[in-house]
Swiss-Prot record:
Classification via InterPro entries: SNARE (IPR010989), Syntaxin (IPR045242), Syntaxin/epimorphin_CS (IPR006012), Syntaxin_N (IPR006011), T_SNARE_dom (IPR000727)
PROSITE patterns registered for this protein in UniProt: SYNTAXIN (PS00914), T_SNARE (PS50192)
Organism: Caenorhabditis elegans
Ranges annotated as spanning the membrane: 280-300
Main function: Potentially involved in docking of synaptic vesicles at presynaptic active zones. Acts in the intestine to regulate anterior body muscle contractions (aBOC) and the expulsion steps during the defecation motor program (DMP).
Tissue: Expressed in body wall, pharyngeal, vulval and enteric muscles and in some head neurons.
Cysteine-cysteine disulfides: none
Principal localisation: membrane
Lineage of origin: Eukaryota, Metazoa, Ecdysozoa, Nematoda, Chromadorea
Domain t-SNARE coiled-coil homology, first and last residues per copy: 204-266
Record membrane topology: Single-pass type IV membrane protein
Protein name, as recorded: Putative syntaxin-3
UniProt GO molecular function: SNAP receptor activity; SNARE binding
Length: 306
């Protein structure tokens, strides 16, 4: 009985179709180890964004500094105790120190991250270092201006206290006023000012208000001194890192010059080798020709062929 070839071909076609639908292509091999853990471009963009945020904080810090300067002028020009402006001054000073501390910590983190960049990425390292250095400079200028303003206000407030005390014919030296303010015993020194009359009481209140402001200034000056100390340490660390970058760039330049010299020397050696090879070939050809001539002359001499 002949086989049904048509039915057999249909069955094979059905099997091939099923295999085609069930075919699972092999997964593409992906070498994870060869891929970088950090995208350098994305990392640098994030770094610039953080620098931009810190610059925004510096702008806010400068606004607080301007407000402190205006309040100092208002307090020095206002007769009598001004509790409202004194409270505003205290609030702005607290905000200034709080923001300055945050900026200092952020700069410290950026500086540490920059120092951990491998020396092979000199371009990125230098760009980040320049950004941090610029922010450091701006921050340092704001802090120096604030410190200078605090010193000037302290001296003006002390002179105003002396002027008030002179009204009651109380002569105190700068050292006595300094000790009274720092110890909080100004009331003992100026107790002669406190009389029954309302005018004298107001005068005493103003002197005491100025003294309280000076006490706050003394405390803030101590905080400023500590902050400047920390800032100096970070600037020194940043300078060392910049020196390291410069040394790396100089070493890379020296290596490049040395490599260029090696390449030129290799080219010269290659030229010499070619010349030597040509000379050897020419010499070999000449030697072969001489040998042929010698053999020919010898054959002609010893045989009657020639």
């Amino acid at each position: 009985m002949p086989r049904d070839r048509l039915k057999e071909l249909q069955e094979k076609a059905t099997v091939n179709t099923i295999h085609a639908y069930n075919y699972d292509p092999p997964a593409r091999k992906y070498d994870v180890e060869s891929q970088p853990l950090i995208n350098q471009d994305a990392d640098f963009e994030m770094f610039l964004e953080r620098c931009s945020n810190i610059r925004g904080g510096l702008k806010s810090l400068e606004e607080d500094y301007d407000a402190v300067v205006q309040l100092h002028g208002a307090l020095l020009s206002t007769p009598g105790a001004d509790s409202e402006n004194s409270n505003k001054l205290k609030s702005h000073n607290q905000m200034f120190f709080s923001k300055a501390e945050q900026i200092k910590n952020s700069l410290k983190i950026l500086s540490e991250e920059t120092s951990r960049i491998p020396t092979t990425a000199c371009g990125i390292m230098r760009a980040k270092s320049d950004q941090v250095k610029s922010i450091y400079k701006t921050f340092e200028n704001i802090m120096l201006n604030f410190n200078r303003e605090q010193d000037e206000y302290k001296e003006k407030a002390k002179r105003k206290i002396v002027d008030y005390l002179k009204i009651r014919n109380m002569q105190l030296s700068d050292e006595e006023i300094e000790n009274a303010v720092s110890s909080g015993n100004l009331s003992e020194v100026t107790k002669g000012v406190m009389l029954a009359l309302n005018e004298k009481k107001a005068l005493y209140d103003e002197v005491k208000s100025r003294a309280d402001e000076l006490k706050n200034l003394e405390r803030q000056m101590g905080e400023l001194a500590q902050m400047f100390h920390d800032l100096h340490i970070m600037v020194v660390s940043q300078a060392k890192m910049v020196d390291s970058i410069v040394n790396s760039v100089e070493n890379a330049t020296e290596y490049a010059k040395q490599a260029r010299g090696n390449v030129e020397e290799a080219r010269n050696l290659q030229k010499r080798a070619r010349k030597m090879k040509v000379c050897i070939i020419i010499g070999s050809i000449i030697a072969v020709l001489i040998l042929i001539l010698f053999i020919q002359s010898a054959v002609c001499h010893f045989t009657p062929i020639c």
